[in-house]
């Protein structure tokens, strides 16, 4: 088993990540993310059923989720609970490295009607903190121990000595125990209101992903999310810190970057396919978000 170098995150129309982490028999993935290799320079909005810990190795990062932005420095760790919509990007574009550890919680907990799941997993997964941050220092309770366990997992995952599957499972269980003990100090557990916001957000994003190349109104988007225009805008601001229009623009630009890199379509065609009203409008928006024109972007690939 090898540590994988990732360079993109593939998602479906609901922003659920489509990649399988590890294997059916051993659902654990360990990735070294070097952001100089990433196609868009960052990890875009996504969610997954697995647990994730990101461990910052080099550079500084911003992790956005549910209305929060967490500034992460080398040696710091962030735990992201299952089902949480998040994205992460380096403060300095294209510079930074982190390890991502992603695993299926049922791999550790066993059956949902078993004692281990009910005692140590059910509350944390269903109503526990959406994220936790720890510093890998002796002064940070739990942080140093989690960092040591993650370092051991990287070595086991890449070198696979005898019994390494069992050793990794034991280390992940120790990490989970430490996270449970931190949980009492963690902010923002899941509430019915946040659960409702998350469902509306995913419905709206699903529609945007399926129709970003078309023109549609805010009213239509709100209908798809089963709410009103004003409430949808408040939901986006609470959860993502931006209005729906801004999220749609970012997504259109992301898709345009992919087409500019991976297709022979003209710039006018890329503009049309990604929902821009004209090539000039596309060019000005692309310059604002990416820092260069579409033509310059393609030339520098």
Residue ranges with predicted function:
Residues 2-34, 82-155:
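A hydrophobic/aromatic-rich effector-binding and dimerization subdomain
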Residues 46-63, 79:
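Short, conserved beta-strand element in jelly-roll/cupin
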Residues 67-81:
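Short acidic-glycine-tyrosine-enriched beta hairpin
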Residues 177-185, 203-254, 265, 269-300:
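Basic/polar phosphate-binding segments, predominantly the helix-turn-helix DNA-binding elements
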């Amino acid at each position: 088993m090898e540590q994988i170098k990732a360079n993109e995150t593939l998602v479906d129309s609901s922003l659920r990540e489509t990649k399988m982490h590890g294997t059916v028999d051993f659902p654990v993935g360990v990735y070294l993310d070097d952001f100089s290799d990433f196609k868009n320079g960052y990890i875009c909005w996504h969610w997954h059923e697995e647990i994730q810990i990101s461990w910052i190795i080099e550079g500084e990062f911003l992790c956005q989720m549910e209305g929060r932005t967490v500034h992460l420095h080398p040696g710091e760790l962030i735990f992201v609970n299952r089902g949480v919509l998040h994205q992460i990007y380096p403060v300095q574009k294209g510079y930074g490295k982190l390890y991502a550890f992603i695993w299926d919680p049922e791999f550790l907990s066993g059956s949902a009607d078993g004692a281990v799941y009910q005692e140590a997993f059910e509350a944390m997964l269903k109503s526990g903190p959406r994220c936790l941050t720890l510093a890998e220092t002796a002064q940070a309770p739990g942080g140093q121990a989690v960092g040591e366990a993650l370092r051991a997992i990287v070595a086991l995952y890449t070198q696979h000595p005898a019994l390494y599957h069992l050793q990794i499972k034991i280390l992940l269980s120790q990490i989970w125990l430490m996270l449970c003990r931190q949980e009492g100090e963690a902010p923002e557990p899941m509430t019915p209101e946040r659960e409702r916001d998350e469902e509306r957000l995913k419905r709206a994003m699903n529609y945007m992903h399926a129709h970003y190349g078309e023109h549609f109104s805010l009213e239509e988007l709100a209908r798809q999310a089963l709410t009103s225009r004003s409430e949808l805008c408040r939901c986006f601001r609470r959860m993502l810190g931006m209005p729906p229009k801004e999220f749609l623009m970012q997504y259109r630009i992301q898709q345009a970057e992919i087409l500019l890199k991976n297709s022979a379509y003209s710039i006018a065609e890329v503009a049309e396919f990604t929902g821009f009203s004209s090539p000039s409008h596309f060019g000005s928006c692309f310059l604002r978000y990416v820092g260069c024109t579409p033509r310059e972007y393609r030339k520098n690939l």
